[in-house]
Amino acid sequence: MQWTVIFENESLKHDFNRLSRRQKILLFSAYLYRQVRLIKEFDSLYSEDLSTFFTEVLGFVVLEDKEKLRNIVEVIDGRIPDTDEFSEQEGSYAQNLIIALRYLVCFLLRIDESALQKCVDMSLQNIDLINYDVDENYDEAEVVAREAKIIAVFIERAIRYAQNKVCDIDTVKNIVGSDWV
């Protein structure tokens, strides 16, 4: 699964293209945060405390705290789990999610739309892996449709919550609602 399958879909493309920068940051922060369970499972298996780091960095992203994020890309690079060392499936999930976080930070710092696409692609790899683990012959079209519906809901929520004066990690949790992975 990739960005184009979901975001080039006519039902989402128009709404997505109208989003402000702040709304996009909220949207993609929530889209990543909905997978936080995967990093928590990684932590429980490997005791790396990566979920705290993930949540902290995501909090800086939502606050658009460029000062704190300036040098964080290198720190993120150092925290990406190596699947040779962390060989269980949780290592792959955590690796994909931390790389997705890195791309989200790069988008914020450089306003690079391609970084958003890479962020989503890494996140979708986890969705693909999860579904493959459940059923090797899963219906990708069905999963894509489900992810598109979630994105549509997140777009609506991001638009609504972006009107708040201050957005933080709790705002992201509100956007996720009950749509956890």
Could you say what each language-model-derived stretch is?
Residues 3-5, 10, 21-146:
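Structured binding/interaction patches within domain cores
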